[in-house]
Each structure stands twice: as structure tokens, then as C-alpha cells.
Amino acid sequence: MERRTLLVVLLVCSCVVAAAAEASPSRWPSPGRPRPFPGRPKPIFRPRPCNCYAPPCPCDRWRH
């Protein structure tokens, strides 16, 4: 029973340390918005604005 309690305590402590390390402001440039991957931030998909000057406009197909 003592061994199981020790394992639970170690597991909880490791989770607390991991959460504290992720939320530390020294690791991230902006502490309010942590990034999931420190080396490569996930790119945000933004559709390009479409400027059509000709009648057969390809943007009409993209807009729903």
C-alpha cells in the first residue's frame, strides 16, 4: 500500500512540475498565450484576400 501511495505522489508531483514549467513566463515570450511546440509554432491558416477584376472570377467558387 505504501508503494502505491508513493507512486501516486510522484505522479502528481511530476504533473505539477510539468504544468509549472509550461506556464513559466521565462520559457515563453508571451505568458498569456503558450505555444504547444517551442521550436516550431503552428501556422495559422488564413485564406488570401481575393481581388477580382475580370468577369470569370475564381473567388466565386471559394466563397460559400
UniProtKB/Swiss-Prot annotation:
Source taxon at top rank: Eukaryota
Disulfide bonds: 50-59, 52-57
Chain positions covered by the region annotation Cystein-containing C-terminal region important for stability but not essential for antimicrobial activity: 49-62
Tissues in which the UniProt entry reports expression: Mainly expressed in hemocytes. No or very low expression in heart, gills, inestines, and epidermis.
Keywords, alphabetical: Antibiotic, Antimicrobial, Chitin-binding, Disulfide bond, Fungicide, Immunity, Signal
Region of interest called Disordered, as start-end residue ranges on this chain: 22-43
GO BP term, example: immune system process
One function term, GO molecular function aspect: chitin binding
Region (Pro/Arg-rich region responsible for antibacterial and antifungal activity): 26-48
Ranges of Pro residues composition bias in the record: 31-43
Propeptide: 63-64
Signal peptide: 1-25
Posttranslational modification: Disulfide bonds are important for activity especially against Gram-negative bacteria, since the linearization of the peptide causes a strong decrease of activity on these bacteria.
Protein purpose: Antimicrobial peptide that has a large activity spectrum with activity against Gram-positive, Gram-negative bacteria, as well as against fungi. Shows activity at micromolar concentrations. Displays minimal inhibitory concentration (MIC) values lower than minimal bactericidal concentrations (MBC). Synthetic peptides with similar activities than the full length peptide (composed of the first 23 or 25 amino acids (Arasin 1(26-48) or Arasin 1(26-50))) may have a dual mode of action depending on the peptide concentrations.
Subunit structure, interactors included: Interacts with chitin through the N-terminal region (26-48). This interaction may be important, since chitin is a component of the fungal cell wall, as well as of the crab exoskeleton (permitting a possible action of arasin in wound healing in case of lesions).
Protein name: Arasin 1
Source organism (scientific name): Hyas araneus
